[in-house]
Amino acid sequence: MDVLRAREQLRRRYLFPQDAEVPLEHEGYPRPETSTAVEKKEKPLPRLNIHSGFWILASIVVTYYVDFFQTVKENFHTSSWFLFGSALLLVSVSIAFYCIVYLEWYRGIEDYDIKYPALIPITTATFIVAGICFNVALWHVWSFFTPVLLFTQFMGVVMLTSLLG
């Protein structure tokens, strides 16, 4: 019976970190002060890293090889989906620049998502609907490649925007 108890205690000992061990027999002894939520100041990632560089480069390559601007210029006036998507994208980008430039840089509000909780869901919803509109508008050009091409363009723009702040 003692062997089973010793094995169980040994198993339990290694379930917890070494500094969390407190002898249960000595109730009168003060317990060591340990914080379960240790807050470490992590060093922020550099703004231009391999990941963002890849997406920016991929966006440039896609823009060049699929004649993106020529296609957009040809389909600009023919599709109401494209015009509606452009208007929604303009709203989304305007809200994003309002958050980044005005609230964060000019007013100095770091946590604008806490002070103005409706901004981020509205921006996200308008951007998703704009993406759907662009997919519908450009589907006849690239077919099944349209979502992939637009996603690559989106990630390139996001990574380029993230260089701002």
UniProtKB/Swiss-Prot annotation:
GO cellular component: a single term: membrane
Protein's UniProt keywords contain Transmembrane helix: yes
TM ranges: 49-69, 81-101, 119-139, 144-164
A Pfam family hit: TMEM128
Subcellular location: Membrane
Domain of life: Eukaryota
Record's keyword terms, sorted: Membrane, Transmembrane, Transmembrane helix
Stored InterPro entries: TMEM128
Topology of the protein relative to the lipid bilayer: Multi-pass membrane protein
Protein name, UniProt field: Transmembrane protein 128
Species, as recorded: Bos taurus
Gene from which this protein is expressed: TMEM128
